[in-house]
Amino acid sequence: MYRKALALLVLLLSAGSGSLSPVQGEPVTNPGVEEPVPQPDSSRTGRSSTVGVGAVGVGLGDTERTTGLRLNWRNGQFQRANGVNLTLWTPYSVNLGDEDDLVDENGEFGGDAFVGTTNGIALGLLHFPRRIRGVGIGGFGPVAGTLQGVAVSGIVVATVEDLNGIAVGAGGAAAAGDINGIAVGGLAAGADGPGAGEGTGPDAGGTVNGIVVGGLGAVGNDMRGAGVSAGMVRVREGGTLKGLAVSAYNDINGRQVGLSIGLYNHARVLDGVQIGLLNVARNNPEWARILPILNLNL
């Protein structure tokens, strides 16, 4: 459900783009695995040419493979770019006015949206690479299958699978898999792994190995590292915090092993320290379950 929410966010960002006609591409069943892209017919791709030798040089338009500089509007037959890939808009397989083009048969974000791998620098307004190895920069966002490197966006950075590296989004940074590294979102940052909760914000969940920073919320199913937010840090039921949580409201619905600092701290199982105006540790003796200023179980 978190993936569907990402799809809806993309639809909102694309308001007014209904003039883009849908063209169905081959489904991407596993964005984390590079698969050969079938040769599409001319109605599903844009024109292309390469200035150089073979696939090395400057690729203009919807080239399949380019080593060097690739300049393009939208992707259809694109498979791989080594170097700098500037693709301004979404693939031909995606009509942003139709949610069905952004979700798969299970209603989760993905579907036909992801095309090609960039090894190097991926640039665009709103682009959907299957994989980024290197740097991704977008106006509305790089929304990728997987990320290995650094991504920066004026709105959102999101991955359908794991986010490995650093992601910074003015609106948010999210992974529908795990976050291994650092994710910073102006509003929220979090991970939504298999078996996680539904929705966004406090209802998202996944595994965070590193640091997540969100203006209103930082969430995960498990956190090994740190969660920081002006609003809430949440670890879902059955999850574990191993490290640090700093926010106004730290809600650890599993086991806390480490330190939480906030106005209100809550832990189902505390094996660490809480510092705040009010501290709740449900596994403590009755007299020590709710304490001001400091609570601990070591």
Task: Enumerate the language-model features and the residues they cover.
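Boundary at the C-terminal end of the N-terminal hydrophobic targeting segment
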Residues: 20-25
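Surface-exposed, glycine- and small/polar-enriched segments that build interaction surfaces at terminal
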Residues: 26-298
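Bacterial N-terminal signal peptides that target proteins for export
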Residues: 1-7
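Bacterial N-terminal signal peptides
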Residues: 7-17
